[in-house]
Amino acid sequence: MKKKIALIYGGNSEEAGISIQSGRNVSRNICREKYDVYEVLLKGVDWLVMNPSGDAVQDDLPQRCLEALCAGEAAESVMAAGAGAPVRVDKCTFSFVHQGETVKFDMAFIMIHGTPGENGLLQGYFEMIGVPYNTCSAYVSAITFDKHSCKRFIEHAGVKMAKDVFIRRGSSYNPEEIIGELGLPVFVKPTNGGSSFGITKVKRVEDLEAAVELVFKEYDSVIIEESIVGRELTNGIYANGSELVKLPVTEIVTTREFFDYEAKYLGESQEICPAHIPDELTARIQQTTEKIYRYMGCSGLVRMDYIVRDGEIFFLETNTVPGMTPMSLVPAQVRAAGISMEEFVNTLIENIC
């Protein structure tokens, strides 16, 4: 009997639309001979099965439903499209009812970028109800999603990182002292944002306070990091049984100030994979990726981002639910490794505990 997979996308962050694209791309590559795939759009308390019949999902349905929910429409109006319309997930049993029959999910494939899919909340739910899933644990996801906590954890592994200052909303801070410690320019970031949303590059001390307060409009804490000028590189890694598979390294080249949302998703960057770097540097980056993966206790697919300056590798951040759109970094690394997307996705599923 085929196992039933809940492929979950959407979420409550600015990345919900990208999450849908990632999830749809994953869905297209799951082997239907082995699995029944149900796509689940999550937005707040609304968890809606897009294809309760198990048939293919209309291409624009998830995005239309997301936009309707974001506009304040009740989920019931989204679900009122007749036969084959979305239905609610029963969160107590992680199941749904279709034509009088209860369908219970066997496992979850989380493709939500940001909250609640990348910060441990959704993982905690699945751990409580005993449903296996594809990402890092709730504990590891919570640590890696918070840039400050992640850096404090990883620094004990002997990995180099940019110097930083952490500020929580309501705390006092002195811009001159911060710049005196970190120099200029600096990057001002929310500690728990994704896809470079809310990041500002500050070049003058008098602009620092405005950048910090801009973050505080949406987030409770901020991390200010020194700028390290170098080559931006990223590396994916995933578990296949007892083996850790390290994907080729990608170099990111952009004419923008940094690799922000526009550079990532609107084509304003060039991703070179495999990166045109010495084999020795590639090996050191992959070794660092494996070192962090093991030290953090990661599982599933993870992507690590770095800056390399004069041969020194500086860790930037860990992505525990990396983008999986056709133009995302990991799928490009998979192609460069000579692995088909279908083989890759089904390997990830087979390794769900």
Positions of predicted regions on the chain:
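ATP-binding N-terminal substructure of ATP-dependent carboxylate-amine bond-forming enzymes
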Residues: M1-Y139, I143-F145, S149, H156, ...
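Active-site nucleotide/adenylate-binding loops and adjacent lid/helix of ATP-dependent enzymes
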Residues: K2-Y9, S13-E14, Q21, H98-V103, ...
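ATP-dependent carboxylate activation and anion-phosphoryl transfer catalytic cores
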Residues: K3, I8-N12, D279-C353
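Residue-level detector of anion-binding/catalytic polar loops
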Residues: D36, P132, K160, S221, ...
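Short, flexible, mixed-charge acidic loops at enzyme active sites
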Residues: P52-A56, G124, F259-L266, T320
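A glycine- and small-aliphatic-rich helix-loop capping segment at beta-alpha/alpha-beta transitions
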Residues: G124-Y133, R204, E209, A336-A337
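Phosphate-binding site of ATP-dependent enzymes
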Residues: K203-Q287, V308-F314
